[in-house]
């Protein structure tokens, strides 16, 4: 599962150095971390929903998720401060590359009517956000283990200064962007 990291070091980094004219290898953008987040609004009624979602996310990312809690009480949402509202995992290093490779090669092609990911989902600082509607696209999750389909947000944090640099990095890493 070192293919993506090897590809970055051998092909992507030299190509980006030439394309953007970096003087140092350390100036070339790289992927810093990947944050996978699941918001669980239904956890207020069903206390086991967080446990089930955490188990599924741990299978997908190979890392135990942390439970995120509400910062403020909001009476309209029947939400109290400190109530669990979601789960998240921050992937770095080896696990990050394993997850990204799994997402590119297995997960994204299994999405129904997939024509590529949105090329405009950059935040202006070189980070990319991707929303996935169901967790069934990952091979670790079978249809039998799922009680409810849950979506997730995937944020790819890069060291790129601009969106153009980040897009070039992610495109050369193999992320299939939609043609505009």
Curated annotation (Swiss-Prot):
Signal peptide: none annotated. The keyword tRNA-binding applies. Keywords: Ribonucleoprotein, Ribosomal protein, RNA-binding, rRNA-binding, tRNA-binding. Disulfide bonds: none annotated. GO terms for cellular component: cytosolic large ribosomal subunit. GO terms for biological process: translation. Gene3D superfamilies: 3.30.1440.10. One of its GO terms (molecular function) is tRNA binding. InterPro entries: Ribosomal_uL5 (IPR002132), Ribosomal_uL5_bac-type (IPR020930), Ribosomal_uL5_C (IPR031309), Ribosomal_uL5_dom_sf (IPR022803), Ribosomal_uL5_N (IPR031310). Forms a bridge to the 30S subunit in the 70S ribosome. Part of the 50S ribosomal subunit; part of the 5S rRNA/L5/L18/L25 (CTC) subcomplex. Is known to contact the 5S rRNA, 23S rRNA and the P site tRNA. Belongs to the universal ribosomal protein uL5 family. PANTHER family: 60S RIBOSOMAL PROTEIN L11-RELATED (PTHR11994). This is one of the proteins that bind and probably mediate the attachment of the 5S RNA into the large ribosomal subunit, where it forms part of the central protuberance. In the 70S ribosome it contacts protein S13 of the 30S subunit (bridge B1b), connecting the 2 subunits; this bridge is implicated in subunit movement. Contacts the P site tRNA; the 5S rRNA and some of its associated proteins might help stabilize positioning of ribosome-bound tRNAs. HAMAP family: Ribosomal_uL5_B. This is Large ribosomal subunit protein uL5. It comes from Deinococcus radiodurans (strain ATCC 13939 / DSM 20539 / JCM 16871 / CCUG 27074 / LMG 4051 / NBRC 15346 / NCIMB 9279 / VKM B-1422 / R1).
